A protein has these predicted regions:
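Short, acidic, small-residue-rich periplasmic hinge/interaction motif at the N-terminus
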Residues: 32-34, 43-45, 75-79, 89-132, ...
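Short acidic/polar hinge/loop motifs at secondary-structure boundaries
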Residues: 61-64, 186-221
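N-terminal periplasmic accessory domains that precede
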Residues: 89-99, 112-118, 139-142, 163-168, ...
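Transmembrane beta-barrel strand/turn architecture of Gram-negative outer membrane proteins
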Residues: 149, 164, 213-216, 225, ...
Length: 532
């Protein structure tokens, strides 16, 4: 009886062998698109072997292989790659490929030293390909709303500042919440500090990279992040840039240009001159003992015209005075190709981001040079060189009312004028001084003087200049068909030079710095950051 059972089990196992193995190792199938259109020229291969075939005009192919294990891969231009395990199931008679303009299909998730199909990976990890990212001047803002659990929030409207991002929300109010960035398998330690020169300003994390040079990102939130130790305690974001790894050896030249306008739309609501006069009248009576004392310090509260009407007879929206629509552009020129020995992928780009605060902008010149050279059948050498040069015209931010133009515009009285007015009505080209409206030399309460917002955006010089270099070189050695040993070296260098000049002696339109003792304020700093 046991022999009969054994015979039946063997018979069942033999019947479970894939159909192509029973026919001498021949795989036959038909490749179609989602609309049932036959796909001609699709490449079918068994990964790791020389067995391959190409589909004909009817989408049919026939491939001979003696492999019972491994992966069957189907590649077609303009479609997602599809794979089937030879061991687990019979290859279907009709294989459907999905066009790559569909978002979030299977694809692959890229890890530091291997890739994994998205439909087989851990659900706690997520990835995003370039085709699914947003068009953005900032590389990190291109990920916004792309990955579940990855929070990306733009820091401010200042050009070049980028975004704050974290995984699974804020974990601490003291330490850093940002996840570890890993670019092409190498941890990326960027300058995340707030500037000591330009108040409230911090650089974009990926300021040296163009969004078009990012091939894919993967967010690690689970056990996979443990390989980075305490550095990965806030999660890990794996970034893969464009590489010289395409199987298409034809020389390809492309240009991508994006042009647009940044609009200053939603300003903080502020009082007009009439509303402010009513507000000051009400709030003033809670401090002053009499209306006469209040009107003596603020004569524009008196009904009708008076000797000081030329100073206060205005209605200015200060936010509109210092903001404007700004032009933005992002341009990338790319050339890629190669031959059987060497491949290359080179991009050159120029980015100009105008800020909505007048006279602010950021310009970037960058290049990404990738190469892959096959030294022998078992050895190849690869390099990635990213170079960027950035210059910016900025303004101070944060709770510094003397030099933050947006804060000054919020505090400034709407009935004052940005330029000097004479008592006879003549308008001068010089900026109104910060205390030009102080009509009483001995006020009951000290005047709350505010810097002239228009003078801030036109005379303050806040600049930065950055040289950023990131070089990676490596070697792949394949001692056997199933083993690959990779060695890499990475050098990162960042040079940042910042300067700030706040004038005050000539026009006296800006509240003096250093507790009222410094009329001209100069600050300069240099930061050098390197890692390898």
């Amino acid at each position: 009886m046991r022999r009969i059972y054994s015979f039946l089990i063997i018979l069942l196992m033999m019947s479970a062998i894939p159909a192509f193995a029973q026919k001498g190792g021949v795989i036959k199938s038909r490749i179609v698109s989602t609309d049932n259109t036959p796909l001609q020229g699709a490449i079918v291969s068994v990964v790791g072997t020389s067995s391959s075939a190409i589909s004909d005009e009817n989408g049919n192919f026939e491939l001979t292989t003696d492999q019972r294990k491994g992966t069957l891969r189907i590649v077609a231009n303009g479609y997602y790659t599809r794979e089937y395990p030879l061991k687990k199931r019979v290859i279907p008679r009709e294989i459907v490929l999905v066009p790559d303009n569909f978002s979030y299909y299977a694809g692959t998730t890229q890890y530091p030293f291997y890739s994994e199909r998205r439909d087989t990976r851990s659900a706690i990890n997520a990835s995003l390909d370039r085709r699914d990212m947003k068009n953005s001047i900032s590389a990190d803002l291109a990920w916004q709303d792309g990955i579940s659990g990855l929070q990306v929030v733009k820091k401010s409207g200042m050009p070049g500042e980028g975004a704050f991002f974290n995984l699974r929300g804020i974990h601490t109010l003291v330490a850093d919440n940002a996840p570890l960035l890993v670019i092409n398998g190498i941890p990326y330690f960027y300058n995340s500090d707030v500037s000591n020169v330009i108040n409230g300003y911090s650089r974009d994390a990926l300021f040296g990279y163009n969004a078009n040079d990012i091939k894919s990102i993967t967010a690690l939130k689970g056990a996979e992040a443990a390989m980075y130790g305490s550095l990965g305690s806030n999660g890990v974001i794996l970034i893969e840039t464009q590489q010289a790894t395409s199987d298409n050896l034809n020389t390809r030249i492309s240009f991508t240009g994006n042009y647009g306008v940044s609009l200053a739309q939603n300003a903080i609501p502020s009082l007009d001159a009439t509303q402010y006069r009513s507000y000051l009248q009400d709030i003033g009576m809670t401090r002053y003992s009499s209306a006469a004392d209040l009107r003596n310090d603020y004569p524009f509260l008196n009904p009708g015209r008076n000797a000081y009407s030329y100073l206060f007879d205005n209605n200015i929206d200060w936010n509109k005075e210092i903001t404007r629509s700004a032009f933005v552009t992002d341009n990338v020129f790319r050339i890629e190709g190669g031959d059987e020995i060497a491949k290359y992928n080179i991009s050159l780009g120029y980015t100009n981001e105008g800020g909505i605060v007048d006279n602010t902008s950021s310009q970037r010149f960058h290049t990404l040079i990738n190469s892959d050279v096959m030294v022998s059948r078992w050895v190849d050498i690869f390099t990635n060189v990213n170079l960027a040069y950035i210059t910016s015209d900025l303004q101070e931010q944060g709770m510094k009312y003397e030099t933050n133009p947006l804060l000054a515009a919020t505090f400034m009285m709407p009935n004052l004028y940005p330029y000097t007015r004479e008592s006879n009505g003549n308008l001068l080209s010089s900026y109104a001084t910060y205390n030009s409206w102080n009509v009483n030399k001995n006020p009951v309460f000290a005047y709350d003087n505010v810097s002239n917002p228009l003078a801030l955006v036109n005379t303050v010089e806040a600049d930065d200049k950055i040289y950023d270099v990131n070089v990676r070189a490596g070697l792949n050695w394949r001692p056997t068909e199933n083993w690959t040993i990779t060695g890499m070296v990475n050098i990162y260098y960042d040079y940042t030079e910042e300067s700030l000049f706040v004038p005050g002696v000539t026009d006296q339109a800006i509240v003096p710095q250093l507790y009222g003792t410094g009329f001209n304020y100069v600050s300069k700093g240099v930061r050098k950051l390197s890692s390898y």
